[in-house]
UniProtKB/Swiss-Prot annotation:
This is Phosphomethylpyrimidine synthase. GO terms for biological process: thiamine biosynthetic process; thiamine diphosphate biosynthetic process. The gene is thiC. It comes from Chlorobaculum parvum (strain DSM 263 / NCIMB 8327) (Chlorobium vibrioforme subsp. thiosulfatophilum). GO terms for cellular component: cytosol. Zn(2+) binds at H389, H453.
Length: 555
């Protein structure tokens, strides 16, 4: 494993002005981690002085410039210290984790989900944590702008109504809880995972840590190669963000890769295995039905979901209904016992713009809405997965129908990609569609890397994919009226006009790349970030901001 990117924090990763800060809870003994960047100047925004900016931070302990971490030991089980006794869980006889912690499960007939407690009127430590985290220690600023800070009660209400989820398996004590819902900050997910053609456990753990450090709010382990269980264990024990999986992939490995030999029993045991390890949410393709297969098979690009194609093959081979649909209530009984959220997979998402918004896609969406209500009956947290390849002018309909058919459960989309001809640049393609759908109410964007449709991404691709989708999510937050997002842009604009390069680097979504590009270009002029009153795009004689300042000064 590369120690520079994982076990040993890079002291300059976020810049020398950056530090890790915590905000204490008032209901529970929690410490909410954030990033604080000190600014060289004091900037005035709406009459308020700012000499620093608190930022939402997904890097966890790995982002602490003073921390040392051994990925072979894992992170500290911080949630174990919060003192919340739900009275409904007990230890199992399951396999010990690499941290020597026995898995826990709900007592017979009980539920331990965030939705369960929310509906009972109970504010959990996780609810208080995400409320503090969403505000970024800027409650006074939010109120000054005419907004309302997020409160634990608001979080509880959103979770109780199913409009938001807090994916936090009781067996994943290492995570820093986060919330997914359209009334909160837009989140992004990064996919990692080995395949039969390459990648080791060390590489996947490194990519997971790398993704968190660059801004991934959740990580999905989509491993389909060897050592799936061990790879997932290492990732979970070192992840400060929720981890999702597609259990069907491991179930398929257990039957030698033959979809026809899958069974409910194999799948059920896989769910329990992964839930005991601490997986926070499962993508489950329960919405693809035998009756919808003819519509999907008539498409230009057929079924492009791996899980969807596996279950379609099983249905055809056995001439039976999808067992993930017929056993959905049984699945929910397992999920409620560990607080694993279900991400209802869009097995029939369009794989080309010619298939967008067709009968197969929207027929499945209605089924997902029906399954949402069944999951909620058991207090299981739900989010809905969405497309896919959709041209810009057809995106709005996706968001409107999702809200209508799926009862306002959070929407989680792969893009959408707005064209089919952007190979090599599909991360940008995805971010274009993602920005639009997130501004309309999508809660989380699944990142796409430059390798989409071409190959397995490496850690540089992960970084690129995360940052591009972080831009999309931030742009959507601005469009939705986020006062914390607006403040960051306001401070950046003021720093830019003042030629305070270090402040610009600190406020950028990618401080490292921003600093590197500027240093490489300004060196040829003999200036530095401390002295340059221009950039090499225009030079000292044609810098519009410099000229504007000179003109204003002469008036």
């Amino acid at each position: 494993m590369n120690p520079e990117s994982a076990s040993c924090p890079d002291r300059h990763f976020f810049g020398p002005a950056s530090s890790r800060m915590t905000v204490n809870g008032t209901i529970y003994p929690i410490e909410v981690g954030m990033r604080k960047v000190a600014l060289k100047r004091t900037y005035e925004c709406k009459g308020e002085p700012f000499n620093s900016m608190p930022l939402y931070d997904t890097s966890g302990p790995f982002g602490d410039p003073n921390g040392e971490h051994d990925v072979r030991k894992g992170l500290e089980p911080v949630r174990d210290r919060w003192g919340f006794d739900n009275g409904s869980a007990e230890s199992t006889k399951g396999e010990l984790s690499m941290s020597e912690r026995k898995p826990r499960v709900a007592k017979s007939g009980e539920a331990v989900t965030q939705m369960h407690f929310a509906r009972k009127g109970v504010i959990t430590p996780e609810m208080e944590y995400v409320a503090i985290r969403e505000n970024q220690a800027l409650e006074e600023w939010i109120e000054k702008c005419g907004g309302k800070p997020v409160t634990p009660e608001m979080v509880r209400d959103e979770v109780a109504k199913g409009r938001a989820i807090i994916p936090a398996n009781i067996n994943h004590p290492e995570i820093e809880p986060m919330i997914i819902g359209r009334n909160f900050r837009v989140k992004i997910n990064a996919n990692i995972g080995n395949s039969a053609l390459g990648s080791s456990i060390d590489e996947e753990v490194e990519k997971a840590v790398w993704a968190c450090r660059w801004g991934a709010d959740t990580v999905m382990d989509l491993s389909t190669g060897k050592n799936i269980h061990q790879t997932r264990e290492w990732i979970l024990r070192n992840s400060p963000v929720p981890i999702g999986t597609v259990p069907l992939y491991q179930a398929l490995e257990k039957v030698g890769g033959k979809a026809e030999e899958l069974s409910w029993e194999v799948y059920r045991d896989t769910l329990v295995e992964q839930a005991e390890q601490g997986v926070d949410y499962f993508t489950i393709h329960s919405g693809i039905l035998a009756a919808t297969l003819p519509d999907a098979e008539a498409r230009q690009t057929g079924i492009v979901s791996r899980g969807g194609s596996i279950m379609a093959r099983w249905c055809r081979a056995h001439n039976q209904e999808n067992f993930l649909f017929t056993h959905f209530d049984d699945i929910c009984d397992i999920l409620r016992s560990y607080d694993v959220a279900v991400s209802l997979g869009d097995a029939l998402r369009p794989g080309s713009i010619g298939d967008a918004n067709d009968a197969a896609q929207f027929g499945e969406l209605k089924t997902l809405g029906e399954l949402t209500l069944r999951a909620w009956e058991r207090d299981v947290q739900v989010m809905i997965e969405g497309p896919g390849h959709v041209p810009l002018h057809m995106i709005r309909e996706n968001m409107e129908l999702q809200l209508k058919h799926c009862h306002e459960a959070p929407f989680y989309t792969l893009g959408p990609l707005v064209t089919d001809v952007a190979a090599g640049y599909d991360h940008i393609n995805s971010a274009i569609g993602g920005t639009l759908i997130a501004s309309l109410g999508c809660s989380m964007l699944c990142y796409v890397t430059p390798k989409e449709h071409l190959g397995l991404p490496d850690r540089d691709d992960v970084r690129e994919g995360v940052i591009v989708h972080r831009v999309a999510a931030h742009a959507a937050d601005l469009a939705k009226g986020s006062h914390t997002a607006w403040l960051r842009d306001e401070l950046m604009s003021k720093a830019r006009y003042a030629f305070e390069w270090e402040d610009q680097f600190s406020l950028a979504l990618d401080p490292l790349k921003t600093r590197q590009i500027h240093a490489q270009n300004i060196a040829a002029t003999g200036d530095t970030a401390a002295t340059a009153k221009f950039c090499t795009m225009c030079g000292p004689d044609f810098c519009s901001m410099k000229r504007s300042q000179e003109t204003t000064a002469g008036m």
